[in-house]
């Protein structure tokens, strides 16, 4: 015990030290802030009290305390009742005992079951006379085995009873079905006071004939026929007998009980008015939608609501969309719920211009705000705003995607198109269709479609099984079936797209058993003095075989090649680094002289490969050139400017001066691609990997001119064993004619600088005539050894037949091979990828896609057996033909409002180093931009292209309402969908799907032989009587965009947008509809309540007057004829709502009118659906297909094909090659170059360009990758595979590239 105080003192010492430190710290805080700790605490408490979240939590806490007190009082009240009841029972028992004692009886506690009689088995045999036979089975214990006869009799009686019961059930069922109609007419068989959780006199909501819901009281539950009806007395007078799906609970359901597809009643706010409408839950609360529910109302509107604005439907239907009256909305909801969470939506951001449909017309509009899945669109014509669901086909990108897929389906059914994914996906700068995913799960999540039950949570429906295709023993049928099982990537490019360097996961790379002794084609690469030919097969090292995989025949042994550097498998601090560049300190002075060969005599290299493997942009500095960056002010804006100073002291400020200097001095060791005037491209910025687990200096083993290093910073996994080949290898059945007689050569002596005299340059220039406008671009091709944008018609480089110097020629780039320094690296979750080790300037050549060239049939077969991850289509012919027919438009113009981003057009030099990295807000990165959700009087819509109209249109169409209106189209406030056809076209049946409707609409709008096609072949339509087209030519927005940027621009960003001939663009006649409302707006019945539109009705009434008074450059009326009119060749007369046809002639607004033939539609439905491929293949076209100027519907012969009529078919260019019908495939799975490792990105930094080098055969271009923007060192290089989502049956590939423009899905 004596040592206890010492222990206590030792324990108290640290505490005292801590208290002293705390005191010192408090004293320091007081001295620094000038306030005491108590004042600081008080200040912090006051600030916390002011915070909204604290006040909200306190309010919630107070409510919780109130609720707890209320519950405690209720519990106490129940306890008191229980105690009182117990006391009363005790008193009652005492009274009973007293009574028994008075009677002289003895009272004892017993159970009622103990005194019950033995059970009696009753067998009822109903007959026609309703006689009941009761047989006492007797005591079970008294039965003996001797009673065999009695048992047999009982069994016979039971069997007879069952037979008679079945017979009576059949008779009763037949009689009840005959009397069912009488029961449904009002013969009430009984009234109930309770039905589940529905009790008479409870508060509920009911639906009135006006389609709005109102509060009331349940006064009766009646059994009518086989169902139940609920009689509701509304608070605002009136009674109604409603079904269970037309009443709702008067409480707000918890969030966990609601799912996508739940049937609810929600509040719709229109200004100061609030209405209750029925709808379905389209989104559950999450962070992106500010914890709100997205509701799709039955009449086509969409809106975000909170939980306190929802009421659950009492007895919803099993398929909730069947309760929607409007057919177009019903089809949309069914497709939406079935496909959820795969929701295609247009990716938008504020300020973008886009075409939006309204009343059957495409109007020029602008994105004002993006709120989750909704976007507020401002119509520039009348400044009207409207909220639209981003997945609605009223937005031009969504409509273009639907129509293109429907058109492809028609061609497949008609045998005009081979069953293959559409390699020209709708990709354009600006709005793109994005497939959102529920990334919280691991796979496809199908939402439950069971109706919301108030007692138990809904059970999800099982996934509908896919019907297997019947196996066919015929060889051709098996081959045809195998063709649809391979996926092929597409190389469609969106010019000028800006995105991140991340990529999506590619298919897993596997090690294969590769024969290393395959022969290749010799390729010439650049040498300063002579052309040196290398044979890849001679340097191919033996590849170790891998046990798994199909057996392959042994190849010839490869001769010994150069030994590869050893791989570092251990953990290193960093990869081997090279010394940094140090600029020389001495200054260069210029003395006036004439530059010649002697200016570079002192720096000419003794060895040809002195700086091989260095950054090509750094090589001029290593040869004593100086690269200086200066600042200068242009138009009150400070910009950067790059100047090169030569060894002789001459300053070079432009690429033209650099090119002239190189030719004047005869410089054959420095080339134009080694110079860059972009101030944001740094030539001495190197990327250094950190602590690799695995490192290889060169995986090409010397086959490439520049070493390709490999590093793994994730684990010790080595790269896949692939036979590296930097050139393409013809496969079985493939012959490439590389003879000089199949080439066109030039005789240039000036390095092919004069494009007008170079035959190879002229091939590139003349090929640009295959554009929609047919105009020749004299500036096409390489500009100072760089390609600023994709050239769809291809680039023709100088070849071995040319007499120009291979080293000095400005038209030789791709054939020189890899020049930039790249690295193969292991990504976190995307397999292996390629990144650059130095900055890459915009337009620079990066690499090619090399591999084995296969025929289409062999590629399909091989893709099923070994995989299709590295397939690429050589479809240059098809891409150019489609481009010529007017399907594509890469260039943003003032009329092509879909996809024009006004912010992107303002491109100039700013003071930041990487201006492209500051991305604008979009619907992905900033889903909820504004905190205050606007509930102003603007319309919201989600579904198909709906036509809403104003009071004036109803007045104009009042005279023809009885004749032109289809039956049962709903109340006047419900817009008529475009899928409902009028005026000679039968309305589609209720069984039609949305895809079939679009396909029927396309085929129904085919133009007859008397139709007119514009010079660009963008669309075909009929000439209206007296409708002459006028030339517009207004380019105000394009001019403003071109002058809004900085006056001084970098060379890499100096891109002039192409312009089409305004005369050709505006040679479009105007077509209007006669005796009908324009855009399928038939007058409606006057029944029902019109949804209040406040000031919108006035704007709608002004639409007709405004559209006729608009500028000729603002409106283009385009109307497709129906099949009956297409055959007769007649045109429609102008309607009353549109005056002169010439007053509405433009590209900015296009009117579309849909119609379909019912019989033709049924025939298409009976056809077997098109079989989809199961092979994904990249396409080597360097651009994307998109719908030009709105819808750009191409007239097809599908209508005549369906009717058995003969229609002329234009011969495809590929058929001139011995009748070939399909393109060739490049497969880089077993043999290939670094291009096989390039991953996908929805916002890539590379684009694909077809280049003709060793042959001018249009079937075999080289597939080259160019930088679409400046790329910072260490950035992963990516390109857009352009898969068409849903094109490969049974395959789904999510995209997680991380780009703002990410489309969500690849397949």
Swiss-Prot record:
Q: Residue ranges under compositional bias (Pro residues)?
A: 454-467, 539-565
Q: What residue spans carry the Basic and acidic residues bias annotation?
A: 950-966, 1048-1066
Where are residues bearing N6,N6-dimethyllysine located in the sequence? 1186, 1194
UniProt-annotated stretches for the region Disordered: 127-148, 404-424, 444-512, 531-570, 885-1174
UniProt keywords, alphabetically: Chromatin regulator, Chromosome, Coiled coil, Isopeptide bond, Metal-binding, Methylation, Methyltransferase, Nucleus, Phosphoprotein, Repeat, Repressor, S-adenosyl-L-methionine, Transcription, Transcription regulation, Transferase, Ubl conjugation, Zinc
Top-rank taxon of the source lineage equals Eukaryota
Please list the residue ranges annotated as the Pre-SET domain: 744-817
Which portions of the chain have biased composition (kind: Polar residues)? 476-494, 1097-1112, 1137-1156
InterPro entries named among the record's database cross-references = DNA-bd_dom_sf, DUF5604, Hist-Lys_N-MeTrfase_SETDB1, Methyl_CpG_DNA-bd, Post-SET_dom, Pre-SET_dom, SET_dom, SET_dom_sf
Q: Where does S-adenosyl-L-methionine bind?
A: 830-832, 868, 870, 1236, 1239-1240
Its Gene Ontology biological processes? bone development; DNA methylation-dependent constitutive heterochromatin formation; inner cell mass cell proliferation; methylation; negative regulation of single stranded viral RNA replication via double stranded DNA intermediate; negative regulation of transcription by RNA polymerase II; transposable element silencing by heterochromatin formation
What is the protein named?
Histone-lysine N-methyltransferase SETDB1
Source species, please? Mus musculus (Mouse)
Q: Which gene encodes it?
A: Setdb1
């Amino acid at each position: 015990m004596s040592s206890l105080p010492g222990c206590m003192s030792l324990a108290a010492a640290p505490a005292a030290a801590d208290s002293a430190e705390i005191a010192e710290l408090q004293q320091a805080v007081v001295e620094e802030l000038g306030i005491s700790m108590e004042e600081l605490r008080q200040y912090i408490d006051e600030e916390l009290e002011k915070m909204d979240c604290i006040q909200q939590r306190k309010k919630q806490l107070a409510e919780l305390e109130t609720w707890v007190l209320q519950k405690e009082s209720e519990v106490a009240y129940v306890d008191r009742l229980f105690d009182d009841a117990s006391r009363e029972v005790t008193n009652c028992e005492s009274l009973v005992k007293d009574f028994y004692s008075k009677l002289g009886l003895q009272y004892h506690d017993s159970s009622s079951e103990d005194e019950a009689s033995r059970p009696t088995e009753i067998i009822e045999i109903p007959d026609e006379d309703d006689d009941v036979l009761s047989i006492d089975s007797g005591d079970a214990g008294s039965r003996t085995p001797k009673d065999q006869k009695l048992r047999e009799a009982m069994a016979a009686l039971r069997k007879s009873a069952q037979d008679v019961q079945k017979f009576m059930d059949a008779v009763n069922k037949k009689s009840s079905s005959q009397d069912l109609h009488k029961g449904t007419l009002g013969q009430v068989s009984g009234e109930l006071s309770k039905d589940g959780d529905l009790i008479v006199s409870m508060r509920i909501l009911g639906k009135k004939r006006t389609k709005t819901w109102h509060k009331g009281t349940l006064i009766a539950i009646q059994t009518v026929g086989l169902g139940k009806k609920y009689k509701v007395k509304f608070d605002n007078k009136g009674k109604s007998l409603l079904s269970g799906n037309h009443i709702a609970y008067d409480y707000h359901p918890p969030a966990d009980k609601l799912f996508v597809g739940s049937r609810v009643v929600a509040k719709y706010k229109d200004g100061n008015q609030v209405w209750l409408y029925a709808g379905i839950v389209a989104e559950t609360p999450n962070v992106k939608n500010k914890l709100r529910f997205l509701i799709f109302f039955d009449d086509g509107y969409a809106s975000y609501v909170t939980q306190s604005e929802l009421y659950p439907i009492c007895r919803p239907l099993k398929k909730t969309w069947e309760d929607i009256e409007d057919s177009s909305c019903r089809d949309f909801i069914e497709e939406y719920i079935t496909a959820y969470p795969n929701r295609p939506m247009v990716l938008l951001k504020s300020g973008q211009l886009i075409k939006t449909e309204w009343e059957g017309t495409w109007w020029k509009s602008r994105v004002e705000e993006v709120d989750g899945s909704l976007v507020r669109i401002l119509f520039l014509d009348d400044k009207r705003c409207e909220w639209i669901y981003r997945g609605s086909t009223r937005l031009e990108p969504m409509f273009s995607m639907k129509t293109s897929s429907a058109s492809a389906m028609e061609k497949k059914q008609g045998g005009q198109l081979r069953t293959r994914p559409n390699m020209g996906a709708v990709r354009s700068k600006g709005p793109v269709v994005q497939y959102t995913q529920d990334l919280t799960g691991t796979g496809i999540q199908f939402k439950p479609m069971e109706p919301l039950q108030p007692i138990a949570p809904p059970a999800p429906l099982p996934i509908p099984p896919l019907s297997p295709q019947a196996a066919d023993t015929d060889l051709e049928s098996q081959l045809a079936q195998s063709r649809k099982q391979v996926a092929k990537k597409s190389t469609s490019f969106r010019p000028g797209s800006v995105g991140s360097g991340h990529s999506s996961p590619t298919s897993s790379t596997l090690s294969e058993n590769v024969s290393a002794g395959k022969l290749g084609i010799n390729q010439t690469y650049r040498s300063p003095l002579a052309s040196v030919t290398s044979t890849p097969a001679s340097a191919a090292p033996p590849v170790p075989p891998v046990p798994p995989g199909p057996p392959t025949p042994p190849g010839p042994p490869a001769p010994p090649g150069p030994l590869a550097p050893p791989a570092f498998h251990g953990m290193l601090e960093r990869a081997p680094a090279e010394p940094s560049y140090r600029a020389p300190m001495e200054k260069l002075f210029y003395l006036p002289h004439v530059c010649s060969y002697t200016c570079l005599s002192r720096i000419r290299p003794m060895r040809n490969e002195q700086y091989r493997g260095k950054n090509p942009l750094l090589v001029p500095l290593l040869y004593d050139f100086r690269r200086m960056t200066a600042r200068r002010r242009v138009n009150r804006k400070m910009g950067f400017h790059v100047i090169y100073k030569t060894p002789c002291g001459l300053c070079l400020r432009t690429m033209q001066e650099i090119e002239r200097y190189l030719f004047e001095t005869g410089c054959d060791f420095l080339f134009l691609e080694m110079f860059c005037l972009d101030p944001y491209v740094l030539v001495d910025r190197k990327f250094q990997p950190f602590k690799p687990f695995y490192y290889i200096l060169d995986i090409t083993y010397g086959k490439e001119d520049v070493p390709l290093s490999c590093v793994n910073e994730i684990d010790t996994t080595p790269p896949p064993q692939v036979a590296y080949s930097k050139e393409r290898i013809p496969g079985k059945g493939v012959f490439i004619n590389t003879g000089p007689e199949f080439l066109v050569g030039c005789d240039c002596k000036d390095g092919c600088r004069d494009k007008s005299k170079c035959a190879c340059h002229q091939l590139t220039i003349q090929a640009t005539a295959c554009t929609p406008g047919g105009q020749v671009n004299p500036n096409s091709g390489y500009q100072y050894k760089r390609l600023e944008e994709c050239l769809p018609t291809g680039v023709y480089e100088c070849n071995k037949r040319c007499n120009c110097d291979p080293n000095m020629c400005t038209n030789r780039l791709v054939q020189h091979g890899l020049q930039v320094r790249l690295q193969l690296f292991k990504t976190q979750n995307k397999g292996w990828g390629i990144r650059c080790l130095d900055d890459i300037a915009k337009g620079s050549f990066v690499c090619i896609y090399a591999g084995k060239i296969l025929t289409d049939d062999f590629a399909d077969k091989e893709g099923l057996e070994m995989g299709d991850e590295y397939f690429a289509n050589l479809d240059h012919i098809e891409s150019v033909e489609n481009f010529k027919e007017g399907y594509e438009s890469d260039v943003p113009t003032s009329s092509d409002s879909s996809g024009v981003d006004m912010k992107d057009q303002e491109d100039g030099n700013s003071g930041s180093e990487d201006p492209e990295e500051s991305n604008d807000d979009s619907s992905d990165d900033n889903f909820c931009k504004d905190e205050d959700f606007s509930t102003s009087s603007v319309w919201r819509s989600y579904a198909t292209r709906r036509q809403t109209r104003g009071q004036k249109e109803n007045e104009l169409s009042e005279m023809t309402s009885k004749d032109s209106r289809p039956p049962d189209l709903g109340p006047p406030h419900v817009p008529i969908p475009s899928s409902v056809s009028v005026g000679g076209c039968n309305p589609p049946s209720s069984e039609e799907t949305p895809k079939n409707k679009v396909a029927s609409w396309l085929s129904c709008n085919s133009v007859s032989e008397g139709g007119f096609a514009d010079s660009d072949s963008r669309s075909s339509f009929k000439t209206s009587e007296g409708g002459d087209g006028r030339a517009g030519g207004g380019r105000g927005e394009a001019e403003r965009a071109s002058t809004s940027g900085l006056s001084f621009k970098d060379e890499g960003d100096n891109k002039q947008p192409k312009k089409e001939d305004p005369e050709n663009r505006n040679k479009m006649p105007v077509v209007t509809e006669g005796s009908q409302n324009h855009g399928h707006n038939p007058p409606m019945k006057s029944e029902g309540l019109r949804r209040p539109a406040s000031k919108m009705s006035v704007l709608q009434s002004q639409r007709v007057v405004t559209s006729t008074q608009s500028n000729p450059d603002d409106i283009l009326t385009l109307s497709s004829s129906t099949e009956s009119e297409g055959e007769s060749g007649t045109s429609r007369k102008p309607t009353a709502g549109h005056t002169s046809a010439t007053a509405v002639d433009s590209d900015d607004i296009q009117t579309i009118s849909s119609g379909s033939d019912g019989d033709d539609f049924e025939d298409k439905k009976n056809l077997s659906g098109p079989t989809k491929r199961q092979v994904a293949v990249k396409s080597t076209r360097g651009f994307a297909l998109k719908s030009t100027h709105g819808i750009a519907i191409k007239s097809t012969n599908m209508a005549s094909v369906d009717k058995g009529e003969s229609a002329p078919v234009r011969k495809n260019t590929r058929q001139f090659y011995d009748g070939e019908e399909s393109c060739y495939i490049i497969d880089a799975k077993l043999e290939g170059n670094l291009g096989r490792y390039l991953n996908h990105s929805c916002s890539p930094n590379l684009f694909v360009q077809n280049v003709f080098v060793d042959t001018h055969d249009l079937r075999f271009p080289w597939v080259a990758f160019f930088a679409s923007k400046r790329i910072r060192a260490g950035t992963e290089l990516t390109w857009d595979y352009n898969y068409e989502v849903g094109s490969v049956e049974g395959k789904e590939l999510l995209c997680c590239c991380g780009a703002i423009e990410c489309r969500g899905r690849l397949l």
